[in-house]
């Protein structure tokens, strides 16, 4: 995996396999690990299970650019796994992709670049923590989207929330108590689609 100082691209892939098909999905995940490890541009990846629905999974990835992500879409084994998932194993999925605008770890803020205009619904905050974060910690500035815990580490949580607007996102990112989280990241979502509504998906030649 490579590291870049450029603005990062976040990908959130939420998937619900058909009943009895979870292991098929996880088998494909294992087969793709060696490909991902050697693929240029992947900065970070972790997988989670929904806290209140153990059939729903999340793959959260950080890429160094849209170009690198596009190259991964064209990987042969990735395309085979994707086709099998869509045709046989997935009941539904949702993909959200966007540029990371800000990242806060402990008391340090980095990668801040708010000189953009975004629709309220196009912003997404991911909050990584070592435990469940109560709704009261963010309800003034955002609404809860979903909560996941680590697939291989039950003490790794990620909470996805939708800020009311950019000002609320700024306030939450800068003021949440550092006792509650390990990292907060703000993304401007440019593509958001599900299995049956792919208006914002790449063309058939460039599936995600």
Language model regions located:
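Short S/T/G/P-rich N-terminal loop/turn motif that feeds into the first structured element of a domain
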Residues: 1-56, 67-73, 89-208
């Amino acid at each position: 995996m490579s590291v870049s100082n450029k603005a990062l691209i976040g990908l959130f892939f939420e998937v619900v396999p058909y009943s009895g098909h979870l292991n098929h999905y996880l088998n494909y995940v294992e087969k793709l690990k060696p490909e991902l490890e050697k693929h240029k541009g992947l900065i970070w990846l972790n997988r989670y299970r929904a806290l209140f629905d153990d059939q729903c999974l999340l793959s959260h990835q950080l890429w160094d650019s849209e170009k690198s992500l596009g190259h991964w879409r064209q990987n042969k084994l990735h395309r085979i796994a994707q086709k099998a998932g869509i045709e046989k194993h997935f009941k539904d999925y949702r993909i959200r992709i966007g540029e990371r605008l800000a990242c806060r770890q402990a008391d340090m803020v980095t990668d801040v670049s708010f000189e953009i205009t975004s629709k309220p619904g196009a912003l997404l905050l991911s909050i990584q923590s070592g435990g469940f974060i109560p709704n009261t910690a963010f309800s003034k500035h955002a609404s809860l989207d979903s909560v996941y815990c680590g697939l291989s580490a039950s003490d790794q949580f990620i909470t996805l929330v939708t800020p009311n607007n950019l000002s609320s996102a700024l306030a939450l990112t800068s003021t949440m108590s550092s006792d509650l989280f390990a990292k907060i990241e703000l993304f401007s979502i440019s593509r958001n689609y599900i299995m049956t509504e792919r208006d914002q998906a790449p063309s058939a030649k460039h599936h995600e």
